[in-house]
Structure formats: structure tokens, C-alpha cells
Amino acid sequence: MTASPHPAADMLPKSWDPAAMESAIYQKWLDAGYFTADPTSTKPAYSIVLPPPNVTGSLHMGHALEHTMMDALTRRKRMQGYEVLWQPGTDHAGIATQSVVEQQLAVDGKTKEDLGRELFVDKVWDWKRESGGAIGGQMRRLGDGVDWSRDRFTMDEGLSRAVRTIFKRLYDAGLIYRAERLVNWSPVLQTAISDLEVNYRDVEGELVSFRYGSLDDSQPHIVVATTRVETMLGDTAIAVHPDDERYRHLVGTSLAHPFVDRELAIVADEHVDPEFGTGAVKVTPAHDPNDFEIGVRHQLPMPSILDTKGRIVDTGTRFDGMDRFEARVAVRQALAAQGRVVEEKRPYLHSVGHSERSGEPIEPRLSLQWWVRVESLAKAAGDAVRNGDTVIHPASMEPRWFSWVDDMHDWCISRQLWWGHRIPIWYGPDGEQVCVGPDETPPQGWEQDPDVLDTWFSSALWPFSTLGWPDKTAELEKFYPTSVLVTGYDILFFWVARMMMFGTFVGDDAAITLDGRRGPQVPFTDVFLHGLIRDESGRKMSKSKGNVIDPLDWVEMFGADALRFTLARGASPGGDLAVSEDAVRASRNFGTKLFNATRYALLNGAAPAPLPSPNELTDADRWILGRLEEVRAEVDSAFDGYEFSRACESLYHFAWDEFCDWYLELAKTQLAQGLTHTTAVLAAGLDTLLRLLHPVIPFLTEALWLALTGRESLVSADWPEPSGISVDLVAAQRINDMQKLVTEVRRFRSDQGLADRQKVPARMHGVRDSDLSNQVAAVTSLAWLTEPGPDFEPSVSLEVRLGPEMNRTVVVELDTSGTIDVAAERRRLEKELAGAQKELASTAAKLANADFLAKAPDAVIAKIRDRQRVAQQETERITTRLAALQ
């Protein structure tokens, strides 16, 4: 080697230790203020709001995926010269946080009622200040480049003001109202809960079929079936399909209730499926969503038979006071005693909604609640996408968006909790009510509504409330609308749709239009929807399956860069992502490869310098620089389209398969030949590669780039621009032919039993005709060959077809005599053959197992088929080689 080592070569350790380096690098970024956004900047703006995680929680693998993608987007835009705001914050998580504090009180034998509302809320604030910061530390460990100076909480005073402001505007516009309607009720928490807080799972229950009306088959009667037989105490009708001939003569009549002094109207309703069961359904309007709709259509009575704790009430029967599950048995037994039970299926597997927080089956229940009238709001949210004001990525998710917003039901926004934004409605002594805005004072002696708002209400204001709305602020002017929302497709309705509804509702507000200097705005111009994280078998992660992985565990094992690269590499738009420890280990190995390549380049003098003119560059130089430009363009295209997987795959294969595996090896040959300009090409390639990788692998690239360039930080470095270097097709073909020739010679050597790097004399024919004269030194070095001596006698040879049309031939003759221990080679091959045959038998057995094929995910079966194919090829190769050694 003729080049001197780079002065910074000794600055790098001999190996990369993420645990020792990443936290220090992150602190350096914070101290330098790289992530602090300046609303007075003249740079173009780019802004993202972080979907606020629950203050009670910790980062799960879905968060890690989401944060990796947002960090990659903002880091790239910062390097492209944008003024970037990545807005962090946490959600007050009403039910979750109240539950945590109530559990702490329970340890001391106390309840929230013992403290009273005001002291309990103070207690929750104390908990938040002491224990609510865990997520921030985890985000730092992951490398999130958020603006911590702007960290917000959905119960901050500024955000509370925004909540009260929009509530009053919606109320004054007639879009918030109070009504008794059906909700998901949690008897344990004693509050309404949102659909998102209901988890459905299959349970083994019972299906009871019983008859209303006469026990005499010749007299009017109808058989119905239910899994919640206790709700028959609230039945007010029986519904049949209008075209069902079996019941047409009964429509308009009624049947007596066996336990309650009530006649059950027989109504015709198209909701009923005449092909299912008996074609007749019991109607309990106060305790079933479909029955409620039937009740509204037919103006049925809606008696509520369950109290807030799930006990039977107000039926006037002996069942009053019973728990719902106790009543289920008692009512069934009472029906059986009358001879009304026709059939009992037990166990009967069916799906039941359970409270995510408290775990018990939820109860649909008629309840007086506050609601948002969504029709006009949902239409505006839908129109924003139809008109192109907001673009959803991938486009395949648009139908799901429209299916939500075009068929949205009014939104229940009240919760029977103490922790949260209190509903700003006040009641007078004679039942009067008034909505009190943030700058108004309630009438003396009036009482405030005890309920709080659904957590999703305040988080729906997140894109603009965090920027200071309803006040006119420099942040709203600079960073609103936000550039892109990155979130999971699973909360498209619960969060995204509601942000769009509220965002379009205030879109023409003076604080947002800048007093009319710009038109109405949407909350974000792009929405990128990512998929869910699954385990390596393709199963959704859940605590019940025991397959949940803490991302911080993998960060500790492999480093944040390795986890981030794994997640980004697997993240295709809208597609789910399977992760495994092996995948993260492979990403760690990729980082090690980059580290070793950079260290090697520095030790051999790589340093930024002007590149020589193209005619001074070698084929290898022109090839690698041309490929680098192609990769840069592909990475730009991929990031612009939120195709993180495509960007990472392109960078991975270029860095590993082309730059490290080929160009570095060719650079050794060039440096040995005295081509000192090679150090500039090495540095140029590494410089651009590290910049392109930085958004996804920020820590390692920062350390390597600083060593290479001696400059301030990659965070503030420029993003690679088009280099103007086009692909030299002639040089690229020569390199492609050289690579094929080296690969074929190496494979042939292996088949001959030669060890890697064991040099043997060889002679090549047809090199000049194949336009490879300038590549002989590279082939000789990389294929571990030596020049033939005067007494060279070839013992084996191979032909390699080259050229774009495979019409050029290079013949390589090798003298392997005396280089192979035949007996030892046979023993080695026989051992390999036994292993290949064992793998072949194992995979064949699995693929012949019908039970396994029926249950295993397609991805697992595909992997086994691949293993079988490889084992078959290995068996054939080794068998052929053994035969040649006879």
C-alpha cells in the first residue's frame, strides 16, 4: 500500500460498541440544539407531530417502528435544508391514568371517593410529575430527534384552553348535544368507553333458544335465540323480515312477555336475516346496538334493565338486584321451568367485547351522554382527501378511509371519570345549562357537568393545539399545516379521522388563515399509514400469546441503529412487518460491516479530496461512482414515496454487496498498483453512503462520518445532491464480467476442494477478446491465483461465458496438483453430505405432515420449502464432487 493512514484512523475503536457510544452521541446532538425548531427561520418548513403515547405507558415495538420512520423523514429533511419541527408530547390517557392512581390508593385501602375529586386529581398530577417521564427516556435511547423544548401534554394549560375553545364553538354550532343513546359500558370502571378500548375475543358461552307466546304449537308463538338470555327482561319486540312468509301473519300483533307485564310487538324489519336461525330476533333496544336501531325505526319502548355496575334493575321481577351473570343462569332456569327452552348449545364459541383496561365483558347500555354530531364534519374530512388537499399513502388505504368517514355515527365524547378535560357545561338550579368558554365565567351557584371528555377529543386537536391555537402564533404560521402524519392504519378512524374533522372545522379560523392571508387549511398534507408489527411467524403481538417484545431489550442487545434499520427495512407502505431477533442481529452485522469498511478505508488513507477527471479513473472507480448515483436517486425516490423498505434494501445491497465486497477489494489492488487517487474515490463513496444511511442509522454513521471528514455533525450536513456522474455502461460491463469470472473461479475452486485464499497458479485465455485486459490483476487477486511458472502444467480448467450476450469466453486453467489431501477432502464432504441429507429428510417430513400444513402460516411453509430446495441442491453438489474424487 502506498497511501498513508488518515489522521483520524486511530480515533475509531477497533470495534463498534453501541452501548458505550449511542447515549453520548445523542447528548451531543441535544447540547448543540440540532433538533430545536426556529419559527422565524427563512428556510422552508417541514413539520410532523408525534402521535402522543399514553403517559402511563412505555414504548412498544409499534412505537419503535413509527418513531424510526418519523425520525428518518425529519433527519433527511433537515439535511435537505428545511426548518424541521418534530413535535413531541404525551396523552393524559384518561382511563389508563386514573386506573393506575386508583390502584395505588387501593394498596392503602383507599378509594378516590375517600379523597374527593379535587384531591384525587391533584394526586394524579403528582403521579404524572413523578412517574410519567419514562417514555421520554426511551425515545432518547431510540435516537428520536424531537424538539424537546416544545414537549407537550394533552392536559397542559394551553391545550386545555384549545379544548374548551373548540367545545364551545362546536356547541354553539349545534354540533355537540346531549342525548340518551347506546354506549359501550364498563361495569368495573363505571364509564362509557370508546370502541378502541374494546377488545373482542372468542369465549365459550351458551346459545339458548326459547319461545315467546303459546307453548301450544298450534297457537301463535315465535322461537328466538340469544347468548345473553338475561337481556330478554328488556325485550320490547320481536323482529322478522318483511318478506318472510312464516311470520307475515303475525306482523302487527304481539306476544306476552313471560316475566314482565309487557306485550312484545312483532315488527317487520329488513335488518333481520331470514336465513339465520329461526329468522326471528328478540329486540332489546337498550342493550344491543342493532336492536337500538330497530327500536328507533319502530319507535319501541327502551327500558334499561342494567345499572352502572351491571346488576338487573327496574324489571319488577325476582331477578332485580342480581349480577348480570347470575341473572343469566336464573332467567334460563326460569324459562326452562315454564317449558319455554327449546334448545341449549353449550359450549358455544362466540366473540365478546371486553374492556381493554379492566378486562370484563362490556355491556351495551342506554346512557345519557354528550355527543358530537359528525355528519358535516365527516363530509369535510372526506372531501379533503377527495379534493387532494390531504393525500393518503399508500393509495390502497383510501377506500378504508372513505368507508369510515362516509358512514360515521355520532361520537360519544363524555366519560364518567375524574381525570381528564372536564366538560365545560354548567347547570342552573332549574335545569338551565350553559357552555362556558375559556375566557368566560360561569353563573354564580351553577354546577359543572361531572363528566370529562373522551381522551380522543383532546388528541384530535394535536396538530394545531400544540402550535398555540386558538392564539395567533409564529409556530402556526410557520409549521401549519403539518407536512405528514405517520401512524398505524389501525387508528385511521379513531384518531386520524377525528383530527381531520376538527382540523377542517377550524381550518378557516383567523389564527390558521393568518387573518385571510392564506386560505383554509387541513391539519396535514400527507398521511402515511404503516402496518402492524408481527412476530417472526406472522402472528400479531399480544400479551396473551406471550410474543410481545420490548424494543429496548433489543436496543440493549444490538444497539438502536440495528433495531431501527430492521424496522425501516421491513416497513412497506400499509403492509404488516414481521420481526425477529435474527433480523436485528443481521442489522447489527451490517453495522459492523460498515464500521470495518470505514476503518479499513481510513487506515489506507481515504480522505475527502476532489475527484480526478473521468479519464483518470479506473473501470472500478467509474462503476462504483455511477452505481452510487443510481442508489442516491433510488433512495430519494423511495423516501419521497414513504417506501422505507425500498430505500433500506437499496442501501444495504449497495453497501454490502458492491461497495464492501467488491470495491474495497478492488481498491486494495489499485492501491498496491500505486493508484493513489483511489483514496479520494473511497472517501467520496463513504461520504455519500454515510449521508444516505444517516436518517435510519444515525449513531454509527455520525461516528464514522466525523472520523472521515472531521466536520461538525451529520445532523447538519447536506443531503447528497445529484452528482452529475452517469453510469459508464462500458466500464460497468467490464466490472460485471470481472465479478462473474471471479465468482465462477471461486466456486470452481471450492468444488475442487481448495481452501479460501489458498493460492494456486493459473493461466487465462481469451482475456483480451473479452475486453478484460485491465481486469487481470483484479481477477488474479480476488480469485486467489498466481502467475503460472515456466513449468506450469494445468490439472483442471473451466470456461466462463461473459458479455451482455454471453458470447465471450474466458478459459481458466489451474494447477491444483499437490494442493488437495484427497482423503481429508472425502471426510469433509461426507460430513457435509450427512448434514444436507438430514436437513432434506427433516424438511420433507414437515411438508408431508398435513396437520402442520393446515396450521402453519404461509410464510413459515415457504421458508421450509426454501430450506428443502437448498438441501437438495447441496446433496446433489456434494454427491457429484465425491464421485469426482474416486
UniProtKB/Swiss-Prot annotation:
Its EC number is 6.1.1.9. CDD domains: Anticodon_Ia_Val, ValRS_core. GO terms for cellular component: cytosol; peptidoglycan-based cell wall; plasma membrane. ATP binds at residue 543. Residues 819-851 form a coiled coil. Pfam families: Anticodon_1, tRNA-synt_1, Val_tRNA-synt_C. Monomer. Belongs to the class-I aminoacyl-tRNA synthetase family. ValS type 1 subfamily. ValRS has two distinct active sites: one for aminoacylation and one for editing. The misactivated threonine is translocated from the active site to the editing site. The C-terminal coiled-coil domain is crucial for aminoacylation activity. This is Valine--tRNA ligase. It comes from Mycobacterium tuberculosis (strain ATCC 25618 / H37Rv).
